[in-house]
UniProtKB/Swiss-Prot annotation:
Domain of life: Bacteria
GO cellular component: plasma membrane
Keywords attached to this entry: Cell membrane, Membrane, Repeat, Transmembrane, Transmembrane helix, Transport
Keyword Plastid part of the UniProt annotation: no
Lineage: Bacteria, Pseudomonadati, Pseudomonadota, Gammaproteobacteria, Enterobacterales
Protein name stated in the entry: Putative transport protein YidE
Domain spans labelled RCK C-terminal: 192-276, 279-361
Amino acid sequence: MSDIALTVSVLALVAVVGLWIGNIKVRGVGFGIGGVLFGGIIVGHFVDQAGVTLSGDMLHFIQEFGLILFVYTIGIQVGPGFFASLRVSGLRLNLFAILIVIMGGLVTAILHKIFAIPLPVVLGIFSGAVTNTPALGAGQQILRDLGTPVDLVDQMGMSYAMAYPFGICGILLTMWLMRLIFRVNVEAEAQKHESSLANGHSLIQTMNIRVENPNLNNMAIQDVPILNSDKIICSRLKRDDTLMVPSPGTIIQAGDLLHLVGQSTDLHNAQLVIGKEVDTSLSTRGTDLRVERVVVTNEKVLGKRIRDLHFKERYDVVISRLNRAGVELVASSDASLQFGDILNLVGRPASIDAVANVVGNAQQKLQQVQMLPVFIGIGLGVLLGSIPLFVPGFPVALKLGLAGGPLIMALILGRIGSIGKLYWFMPPSANLALRELGIVLFLAVVGLKSGGDFVDTLTQGEGLSWIGYGIFITAIPLITVGLLARIFAKMNYLTLCGMLAGSMTDPPALAFANNLHATSGAAALSYATVYPLVMFLRIITPQLLAVIFWGMG
């Protein structure tokens, strides 16, 4: 059997064994995709015992390409929500998550100095303790750039594997501990979360208002400042028994009912100016109007602003809402359309059909993958990661590397959405498939390289010490921030659990948090809020630690 065939066969065996291990669950919690690492260690141990030699160059390529695929698809997935998560609505959650990342780095630095832990080993322990595989890849990349011998770099994978199991368990124990300390009633916490959503300022809501301000009588909608802003959309107007779609030039009269869409604060301000909130229904049922959701798939409208498409003037149709990457937004006139945007349209059936044809609304396109943008993005990411940054006092130029470069480029491209006919939208199923393939390849190689010496290190070497260091790196930041968030910020318990899981980019922990309450989406919402920024920081942190430790000697 050729070297290539043998290497591929062994990797396939690792994937099978590892994924099987990952599917084993105890009380609903398992290693998930992380099981591939342990599959690699098991197979690697027996491969080493049998004296089988695999192609080193091929393994190195597969490891790096798998890492590139993984971080790139993560960037494309979270890109649309990354910058939004930095805004005020998620600022508090992100600050606590950032604190967890910083504390983890500080604990790692203290352990490194006190116990003189070798740099590759301590970076591996850090990556395993926070259950973040891209951090492992980023750390190995920067160590190679700093000229660290290959055999020492491979130790990072072994120490990662030592710290990983408690990284998984530690987050779950922290959630349990918070529940025990504060005597949390999960059902009550879920109800509080739902109440806060109802009063939240970040959610898009609707309000029906009767025009009672005499100063607004016989004024055009465009002449009323609160209605002519990008913060509120007036999608329906009811006069007597007639329901219509208003235009900027529509004259409003006293007694008219307006259906407004916007954020809670803006709707309240509009109500103070216009009149009184009413419970009267402005449903399109039984009228010649209808409400329909259509998806943007036509390349010709990508990047165009809503105001430039003149849907109201041409078709008498109003866009009341815009859903982008699962986030409901006010469809302001300045908003630019991106591939995959979902538009909430109000108008007559024939007019809505006409607008649907303009924006595309081709559901099958959402399942197609444009491969050209994928490789353009990967290529640009690798180039970005290869740009040297010369810092005085360091022996080599610093780089973002094959983990940081593709991630940052994917975040940018995911946020941009499209350039001309090229769009970086990727169907969730395709994104997941490429992401899983990438991480399986990466972890399989890391496990194979670590497997030969793993058992000896655990039983006769410093393996138990490494596990102990990992416990400190996992537990101290999580417990400290958990207590701070609950005591001083009065954070909802379910929201706290989601934030803790997101700060560790840990899907098994999210699954555990979601199972705390069957119907509440609090944990998933906070997880998604902090995940993009934390993933970026987790990849950058080991590189910063490596550079700082290297500079300190």
